[in-house]
C-alpha cells in the first residue's frame, strides 16, 4: 500500500492532494482496515466471475474530527487524488497500475516515497471556467519556480468548470 494521501475538494471536485498525509495510529489502522476489506471484497467478487481483479484501487475515506473513519468510494483505477504520486513516490499510481495489470511484481521499493524525509509533496488542480478554446498563459513563469512541475491535460476546449492541468 502507498503512504496515505490527503485531499481537499470544492463542491465535490478534487482541488489538491498531498502525500504523506499525517494521521494518528488509530486513524491509520481504521483506514487501512476499511481499504483492505473493500479491495479484497472487490477482488474476490471479480475472481469469482472469472476476472483477475488486478490494478490500482483508489480508496477514498473521510476522517471525521472525532477520529472515526468513513468509507466513501473505491475507484478501480488511478484516481485524481493520486496524481500527487507523480511527484512523491518512486513509481506513480499510473506506473503501478500498469505493472499490476501486466502481472508484474510491485515491491515496497516501488511505492516508497521519493521525497526527502520530513517533507510533503503536493499537487493542485488548475481549474478554469468558460466556454471556448483552451488557452494557457504564464506557463514559463510557473515552470521557472524551483520544484514546480506542470501536467497539462491537452483538453482543446473549456465548457463550464474544467480541470485543465495539475501543478
Residue spans for each PLM region:
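Glycine-rich phosphate-binding loop of ATP-grasp-fold ATP-dependent ligases
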Residues: 1-23, 161-166
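Beta-strand scaffold of nucleotide-dependent catalytic cores
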Residues: 1-7, 16, 59-60, 69-75, ...
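A short beta-turn/loop motif at secondary-structure boundaries
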Residues: 7-8, 62-63, 114-117, 157-159
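Glycine-rich phosphate/diphosphate-binding loop of Rossmann-like nucleotide-binding domains
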Residues: 24, 28
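Active-site "cap" helix and flanking loop/linker of ATP-utilizing ligase/carboxylase catalytic domains
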Residues: 29-59, 65, 75-132
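A short, glycine/Asx- and small/polar-enriched loop/turn
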Residues: 64-70, 161-162
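Glycine-rich active-site loop/lid that clamps phosphate-bearing ligands
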Residues: 116, 125-158
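Short cationic amphipathic helices and targeting signals
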Residues: 122-124, 164-167
Amino acid at each position: 500500500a502507498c503512504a496515505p494521501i490527503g485531499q481537499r475538494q470544492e463542491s465535490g471536485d478534487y482541488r489538491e492532494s498531498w502525500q504523506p498525509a499525517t494521521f494518528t495510529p488509530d486513524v491509520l489502522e481504521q483506514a487501512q482496515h476499511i481499504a483492505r476489506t473493500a479491495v479484497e471484497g472487490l477482488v474476490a467478487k471479480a475472481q469469482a466471475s472469472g476476472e483477475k481483479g488486478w490494478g490500482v484501487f483508489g480508496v477514498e475515506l473521510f476522517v471525521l474530527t472525532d477520529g472515526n473513519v468513513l468509507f466513501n468510494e473505491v475507484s478501480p483505477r488511478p484516481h485524481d487524488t493520486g496524481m500527487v504520486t507523480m511527484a512523491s513516490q518512486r513509481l506513480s499510481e499510473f506506473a503501478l497500475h500498469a505493472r499490476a495489470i501486466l502481472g508484474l511484481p510491485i515491491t515496497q521499493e516501488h511505492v516508497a516515497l521519493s521525497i526527502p524525509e520530513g517533507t510533503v509533496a503536493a499537487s493542485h488542480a488548475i481549474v478554469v471556467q468558460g466556454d471556448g478554446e483552451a488557452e494557457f498563459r504564464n506557463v514559463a513563469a510557473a515552470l521557472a519556480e524551483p520544484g514546480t512541475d506542470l501536467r497539462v491535460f491537452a483538453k482543446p476546449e473549456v465548457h463550464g468548470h474544467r480541470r485543465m492541468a495539475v501543478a
